[in-house]
Amino acid sequence: MHKQGKYQFWFITGSQPLYGQEALDEVAAHSKAMVERLKEKLPEELVLKPVASSPERILELFRAANGDNNCAGIITWMHTFSPAKMWIAGLNELNKPMLHFHTQYNRDIPWGDIDMDFMNLNQSAHGDREFGFMVSRMNIDRKVVAGHWQDARVMKRIGDWMKTVNAYQESKQLKIARFGDNMREVAVTEGDKVEAQIKLGWSVSGFGIGDLVEVINSVSTEEVNALMDEYRSLYTFHRDANIAAVEEQARIEIGIERFLQQGDFRAFSTTFEDLHGMKQLPGLAVQRLMAKGYGFAGEGDWKTAALLRVLKVLAGNVGTSFMEDYTNHLEPGQEMILGSHMLEVCPTISAQKPEIVVAPLSMGNREDPARLVFKGKAGRALNAALIDMGSRFRLVANEVEAVENPHDMPKLPVASVLWKPLPSFSEATEAWIYAGGAHHTVFSYEISKEQLADWASLMGIECIVIDDQSNVGQVRKELFWNRRAY
């Protein structure tokens, strides 16, 4: 699997020469101490840059950030007052994501010692407001985080934003391979691929299934045997598992990954209606590739496949999978949704050691496919779907509470997860349907609604979040406003 490179984030402190060189030296020293502490807690490299105290220095720094491929984004903070007209030229040219950090070096006011020297130096309270006005006046998208720089909650929010920017950078260079077309007559999996490349950076290429079959057939027996040994070390095998069927999935896994690596594709889709030349619908093979970090979705759903790859980058490839709303449990007061798919759920969400099972599957009209069977973990999670509204893309997300499933399903040998949608089954599903949310989603225990909203903001697309505070009336109003805004 292609590993995403590590990025840097630049920390730029704003000031001005009005207070003299001694004050600027103290600003630089405070900034250095802050960055050294933050570097210990943040998930990406934080690089301190010289204090920005003139229009020329600011423009130079922003141009350098634009031209540095290792720089994923910048973090700005105004230690003293920094007149915002100094920032106009730099902000006009900046093309990297920006986080405006409203903090100050001292946590507490030194009540007995505070004087005008202290006041002149520690002016974040109005310096950051001045800077914030200019960014808003110029209509520049950015993230704002407020709080003391040593606060664990604040550091986590900055770290979460860094991860989101990584996902943004991945999106801008993402290539998706489609094996076959969409499931016939299905609407929500369709979409404008040209607009997706313009807006999201996603390059989508279609391939006949024969191109893939040729690569699968070139896989050697030795390669299959080596992968089977890996399967035995990671999973249990059902006592009735047809070993030849499992070996076929190993061959498919190697073949698909080889095809993807040759074209630098990091996401892909298949469809059970385009399997000519294949013995099985890819099941275990797809689950394994998702576990390695590839994005995937079934039935030709390239949007969800790409979204899964992007969100796996955001989540560090932990606890994140392709998902489908499968069937409802409507017991009064215990309404829940069973999420699954025919075969393809990622084992990173498993609560137990997955089991390899070979069982019949009517879809695709091929030999019985091998798949990993397991139950998902309990815990707070979310579902996210990306849909094409014709004039724009919309990201729809719903926070859920995944629960331990006490029931076995011996006649349904699939991986699954059971959840309660928030705030309730009726409110969540009604709001989801009003928003046009798809039946295919990305399910994740690791990603927050704030990160999803931040990613959508970076991409310039609409985002609807349904959480424990939502109600249908509120969501319908938001949809109404967004139709006019977009």
From Swiss-Prot:
One of its GO terms (cellular component) is cytosol. It catalyses: beta-L-arabinopyranose = L-ribulose. Keywords: Arabinose catabolism, Carbohydrate metabolism, Isomerase, Manganese, Metal-binding. One of its GO terms (biological process) is L-arabinose catabolic process to xylulose 5-phosphate. Mn(2+) binds at residues 299, 324, 341, 440. One of its GO terms (molecular function) is manganese ion binding. InterPro entries: Ara_Isoase_C (IPR024664), AraA_central (IPR055390), AraA_N (IPR055389), AraA_N_sf (IPR038583), Fuc/Ara_isomerase_C (IPR004216), Fucose_isomerase_N/cen_sf (IPR009015), Lara_isomerase (IPR003762). Its EC number is 5.3.1.4. Binds 1 Mn(2+) ion per subunit. Pathway: Carbohydrate degradation; L-arabinose degradation via L-ribulose; D-xylulose 5-phosphate from L-arabinose (bacterial route): step 1/3. Its cofactor is Mn(2+). Catalyzes the conversion of L-arabinose to L-ribulose. Belongs to the arabinose isomerase family. This is L-arabinose isomerase. It comes from Shouchella clausii (strain KSM-K16) (Alkalihalobacillus clausii). The lineage of its organism: Bacteria, Bacillati, Bacillota, Bacilli, Bacillales. The gene is araA.
